């Protein structure tokens, strides 16, 4: 029973408190509740090291997990206050970017909920990625000073400090902790490292800053612009600072728990989340040898402790750094890396598997694979592609290391918190058990034939659509029709995710309406995406979307039937509002390029129907829901891989033979678009599509248009559509991050649960 009361933390009547005072009181209450619950502990602990933890707002999530949300809500209501005011007041931590960061956040939630001793380990960025705005129909960036808005109060400064040597530069870290609440269980920690010397006043125009002053800039931004050498070096500094702190923390804690370091694998499991934390491997070797362990034994210890998760099929995202970078930043590690590479060369003659290639580049993924005991992909298709093509040479060496762990999401945030209306309906039908055992959602399958239940699902979706419509108008002034189909693509802007394909469909529909077509129901196309500041074509795609939206939304002949909305500064909080309101989930990456995706799972759980390629986790979604409850299109991954292998794809050939496609592409540089947008940027995008189209937008265009037409037609059968929604919700249980984490633990970490 909860004995903590909000009024005990204010010193005066709640009715007399400001929002800030109430927020700080709620924060203090949750921190005390966490301490009362206790923290998961045990002999062996997993350290989940990641450059990103996109945790989202914490207040409501923590109150729900601690079982006191309703109590606090009621106490506020008695004082004439609304808990939603506190939720809106809260500022979102800027500690991540896209799917990688959201996955990390879901995983630490599940680790805590399942009672597994675990810490997330990363960096305490001051300004995160950036805050996005739109001016002149272009993306503009500015610092996201999230730590100045009270959110830093969640982040408790500790008295732990570590020295990190980077060449002649000695850095002294400070560790911060954020409580990670488990749902009905004990808590965990997110450990974040920072430098006290970092100075936000170093930031000039936009997000520009002096990249050479490492002591002042190290943790200013996540993923600093690496289009020049200083930016690349800064990334190496960041990565080493993160893992050196992590390695020192891990060894200290394991010794405290009784390890003699020879038996480190009995006390620690390290999950390397993508290649950013890869330097933890040679850093651990260095620290172990400094403590008297022979280097050869240190290699084996580190291999037994470390496991690597690969998150990408894109070669560009598999980090490779020139050797001279390491000589500049971590000269003390370079001899270790060279000896590790010599050990690989002595064992395997194949030059393609060496850590240091013939050009002197250090391949981080290669180091991870050789010196980890487990290598996993994040969806079955992704893992198969790694084994069969992208990492086939490594798979032949270490078939026993490779395994699949299909990603998952935390249902606590992605339905219980963000969609209480649907949560209430599910619980009414099948009870509370699904909240901790998501497989129980399967019990909803019989209700897919129950018209009363289906009408309830439609009603709740309609409620969320109206709420989002009202919020959007208040937030950025866009008016949308809640009776329209909400067609949603919200994810990081990248050519392989193919926002440009969705844009071409919208242009095609616009041209069709201008020719006299009158759709039965309007469609609102939502985009939400940030483009990396140095990613020119991604920024051009955003510009084209904004220019086109200004045309279509202001055309009285078209806007009653089609609207295009580009959401400003898309983040977790916005996703929590839009995903429950969405009808169609756009998951249209080029087959073979998306490792998994997790947005697809969040949409599915909230009753949106997927329109997607057979890529990433879409393949597993399709198998679970059946072909009647998903809309798939496009080339297969095998066909795409074959095109790349043969280098036989020519964009212009597709453009010439498809008049509908050509008309949509040509519209990018039409008089209307050039008047609305920037000629240079639109021409760049046009030329890129016609001259290269590296992610094969054109071959999938016809199939995409036909399939979306099919989806929009199916939407008109409201009971038929509701059945698709019900099946998707019922089958979403497999994609719980609790299931994923259980698999990691059973197959890789072998921790004992503290529950």
Identify the meaning behind each predicted range.
Residues 1-755:
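A conserved ligand/cofactor-binding region detector
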């Amino acid at each position: 029973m909860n004995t903590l009361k909000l009024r005990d933390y204010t010193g005066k009547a709640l009715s007399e408190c400001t929002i800030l005072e109430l927020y700080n009181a709620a924060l203090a209450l949750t921190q005390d509740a966490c301490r009362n619950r206790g923290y998961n502990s045990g002999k062996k602990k997993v350290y989940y090291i990641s450059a990103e933890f996109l945790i989202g707002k914490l207040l409501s999530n923590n109150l729900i997990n601690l079982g006191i949300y309703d109590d606090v809500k009621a106490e506020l209501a008695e004082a004439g206050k609304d808990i939603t005011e506190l939720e809106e007041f809260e500022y979102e931590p800027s500690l991540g970017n896209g799917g990688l960061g959201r996955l990390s956040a879901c995983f630490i939630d599940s680790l805590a909920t399942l009672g597994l001793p675990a810490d997330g380990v990363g960096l305490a960025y001051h300004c995160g990625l950036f805050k996005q705005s739109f001016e002149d129909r272009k993306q503009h960036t500015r610092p996201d000073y999230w730590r100045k808005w009270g959110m830093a109060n969640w982040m408790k400064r500790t008295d732990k400090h570590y020295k990190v040597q980077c060449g002649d530069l000695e850095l002294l870290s400070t560790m911060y902790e954020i409580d990670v609440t488990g749902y009905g269980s004990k808590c965990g920690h997110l450990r974040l490292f920072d430098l006290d010397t970092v100075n936000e006043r170093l930031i000039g125009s936009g997000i520009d800053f002096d990249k050479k002053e490492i002591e002042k800039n190290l943790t200013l931004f996540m993923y600093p612009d690496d289009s020049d050498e200083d930016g690349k070096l800064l990334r190496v500094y960041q990565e080493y600072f993160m893992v050196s702190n992590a390695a020192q923390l891990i060894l200290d804690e394991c010794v405290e728990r009784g390890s003699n370091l020879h038996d480190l694998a009995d006390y620690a499991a390290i999950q390397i989340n993508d290649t950013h934390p890869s330097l933890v491997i040679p850093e651990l070797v260095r620290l172990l040898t400094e403590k008297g362990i022979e280097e050869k034994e240190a290699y084996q210890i580190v291999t037994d402790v470390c496991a690597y998760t690969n998150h990408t099929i894109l070669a560009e995202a598999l980090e490779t750094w020139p050797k001279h970078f390491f000589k500049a930043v971590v000269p003390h590690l370079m001899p270790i890396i060279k000896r590790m590479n010599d050990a690989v060369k002595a064992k395997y003659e194949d030059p393609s598997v060496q850590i240091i290639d013939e050009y002197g580049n250090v391949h981080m993924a290669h180091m991870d694979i050789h010196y980890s005991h487990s290598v996993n992909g994040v969806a079955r298709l992704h893992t198969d592609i790694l084994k069969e093509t992208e990492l086939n040479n490594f798979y032949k060496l270490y078939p026993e290391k490779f395994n699949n762990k299909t990603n998952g999401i935390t249902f606590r945030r992605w339905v219980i918190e963000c969609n209480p209306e649907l949560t209430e309906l599910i619980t009414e039908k099948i009870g509370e058990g699904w909240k901790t055992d998501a497989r129980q959602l399967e019990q909803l399958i019989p209700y897919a034939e129950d018209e009363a239940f289906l009408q309830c699902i439609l009603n709740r979706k309609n409620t969320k659509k109206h709420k989002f419509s009202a919020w959007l108008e208040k937030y950025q002034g866009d008016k949308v029709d809640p009776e329209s189909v909400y067609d949603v693509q919200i994810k990081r802007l990248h050519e392989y995710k193919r926002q440009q394909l969705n844009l071409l469909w919208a242009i095609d529909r616009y041209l069709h309406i201008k020719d006299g077509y009158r759709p039965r129901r309007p469609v609102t196309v939502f985009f939400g995406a940030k483009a990396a500041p140095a990613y020119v074509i991604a920024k051009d795609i955003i510009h084209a979307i904004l220019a086109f939206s200004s045309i279509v939304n202001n055309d009285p002949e078209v806007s009653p039937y089609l609207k295009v909305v580009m959401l400003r500064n898309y983040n977790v909080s916005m996703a929590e509002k839009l995903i429950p309101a969405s009808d169609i989930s756009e998951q249209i990456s080029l087959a073979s390029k998306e490792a998994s995706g997790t947005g697809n799972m969040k949409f599915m759980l909230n009753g949106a129907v997927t329109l997607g390629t057979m890529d990433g986790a879409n393949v597993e979604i399709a198998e679970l829901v059946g072909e009647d409850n998903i809309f798939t299109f496009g080339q297969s991954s095998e066909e795409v891989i074959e095109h790349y292998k043969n280098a036989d794809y020519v964009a212009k050939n597709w453009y010439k033979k498809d008049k509908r496609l050509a008309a949509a592409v040509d519209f990018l540089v039409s008089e209307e678009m050039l008047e609305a947008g920037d000629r240079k940027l639109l021409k760049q995008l046009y030329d890129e599509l016609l001259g290269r189209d590296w992610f094969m937008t054109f071959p999938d265009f016809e199939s995409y248009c036909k399939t979306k037409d099919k989806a929009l037609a199916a939407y008109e059968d409201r009971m038929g559509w509701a059945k698709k929604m019900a099946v998707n919700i019922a089958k979403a249980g497999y994609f719980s991050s609790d299931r994923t984490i259980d698999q990691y633990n059973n197959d890789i970490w072998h921790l004992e649960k503290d529950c």
